[in-house]
Amino acid sequence: MKQVRLPSSATVRAACAVAVAALAGCAQIPRDPIIQQPMTAQPPMPMSMQAPGSIYNPGFAGRPLFEDQRPRNIGDILTIMIAENINATKSSGANTNRQGNTDFNVPTAGFLGGLFAKANLSATGANKFAATGGASAANTFNGTITVTVTNVLPNGNLVVSGEKQMLINQGNEFVRFSGVVNPNTISGANSVYSTQVADAKIEYSSKGYINEAETMGWLQRFFLNIAPW
């Protein structure tokens, strides 16, 4: 009976380590969202107050009777008019040219029948370099999203964030927004343009078959990681 020799445990562990490393190279790196703060906030519960018996009783957070309804407290909502149009163009070039020429006579003693009775030496050199480069980018994003006030800064500015999800033909679309809004820029319609929002972060992503079609396959990612070129 022929005895079969099994590989040692060290060999098996090494093979498993190589396989795990290869599979890790094929794995798709998850993309973290650029907006890390909460997408909504709940307003604090108002304190119960005894009715004074007057005609007007202040509502939540003591909002005065003759003030507008612009957001100013945590939990208030605000409409963001997204109107982003960014164009960038860059071009560069370099050109150098250098030439040199040297020519002189060297008197020498005649020998070998006057073969080297007179010698002329000359040297010529040239060096040229030319390079050009350019890059351009254009991004346009238009839409609306309603966000929630998540924090009120000491100077009165509002920290807002929110998201919108849409399920279209088995594809889930996400629109996320966050930033800092100056209450003075809010219009009477309770809206503000994204160009007036400080530290604005706008994210548009999707999950579904279309997004998977735009992703490189695992076997292609494997060869991309191990290929030397």
Swiss-Prot record:
Q: How does it sit in the membrane?
A: Lipid-anchor
Entry's localization field? Cell outer membrane; Bacterial flagellum basal body
GO terms for biological process?
bacterial-type flagellum-dependent cell motility
Mitochondrion as a keyword of this entry, yes or no, is no
Tell me which residues bear the S-diacylglycerol cysteine lipid modification: C26
Q: Which GO terms describe its molecular function?
A: cytoskeletal motor activity
Q: Per its UniProt record, what InterPro entries does this chain match?
A: Flag_Lring
Q: Which GO terms describe its cellular component?
A: bacterial-type flagellum basal body, distal rod, L ring; cell outer membrane
Is this entry keyworded Signal? yes
Keywords, ordered alphabetically: Bacterial flagellum, Cell outer membrane, Lipoprotein, Membrane, Palmitate, Signal
Q: Where is the signal peptide?
A: 1-25
- Lipid-modified residues of type N-palmitoyl cysteine are C26
HAMAP family, sorted = FlgH (MF_00415)
Protein function: Assembles around the rod to form the L-ring and probably protects the motor/basal body from shearing forces during rotation.
Q: How does it assemble?
A: The basal body constitutes a major portion of the flagellar organelle and consists of four rings (L,P,S, and M) mounted on a central rod.
Q: Which family does it belong to?
A: Belongs to the FlgH family.
By what name is this protein known?
Answer: Flagellar L-ring protein
What is the source species?
Burkholderia cenocepacia (strain ATCC BAA-245 / DSM 16553 / LMG 16656 / NCTC 13227 / J2315 / CF5610) (Burkholderia cepacia (strain J2315))
